């Protein structure tokens, strides 16, 4: 095809069937040629670079509306684009909660007006709105339903089986779950945190049993109602053993923080900056997460970008908020793990592109395939970099990886043929669009 808008040339292209040296031709925001491409308005030489399909971060909290001093859709997606991310899924625990069509419409409007990447939103599921979820889960811009079984930032708690089952039994789309048992954690808090301000107790308060029990409860209810559940930020070896046996019902997410940091060191070195829910745990749990990545149990790696200001995080535990920023460092940290042989680059792409397609049924994205959106995450696997607080675009302005030297960096973010980021600089703000999904 002649007169292409853009050719990506001389790079190593990660196609669904594997990596190969081939050209990719783009026109009108779509991939139109995969092969020998000539005659374009612009050609980018990608020698020594890996051309990934556009990668997605499927768990972000951008705090808008209601918490704009921590983050906005604009600043959060700026950070995403700088981190090589072409699209984000944002969570419903804002103020007001994303539990009505009106709240969803507001966030979609803000995304179109201000986002630097494409986007979709989780719709919050509660016992109060459960009777409407069959209809509302299919609204444009919705990537799935989200429930919180354990209290976290925001006010979107479904602690009892009755509350969880009300959501599970209404709807067909994927239901993402924050699985921590609120009742067990409340009992733990009375004893473990009594007269203690030690953040190192965070993984004792929110212990293995609280995670495992909630995961077992929600998977049991999902089986009862033939519902697909996506269990988020798994942290324990016990949960992985259980989920490995229940892949017919549940898909699995892990976070870079749980793959990279471990207790007690993280709490000694970072203090409350390492405080997140579920908590960072001991190394034997981390080893189990890596085993689950290796054997295919894990479907998605996402950031759970959950920013708070340094002032908020510098308070006295346990009154400090849980959560760390991570959308800008998600891919760099995973590239460093790939460089160190912890996983292949193909598996990385699977966890951040094909996994999201499988779990969420994303339409025409996340794959270098003809007629799909021309989204690409281009990385230099050999580039070394030192992560700093100063380079973070998030309003929170910090990262738990400040000062960490890594190998592998995103050098270009292309969204629908538009070069949004190149070599650490934002070049162009796209007109962002809601991500589309295949609905049954």
Describe these PLM feature segments.
Residues 11, 29, 48, 59, ...:
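Divalent metal-coordination and catalytic microenvironments
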Residues 11, 316-319, 370-436:
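C-terminal cap of metal-dependent C-N hydrolases
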Residues 200-217, 221-226, 294-295, 299-301, ...:
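His/Asp/Glu-enriched, well-ordered alpha-helical/loop segment
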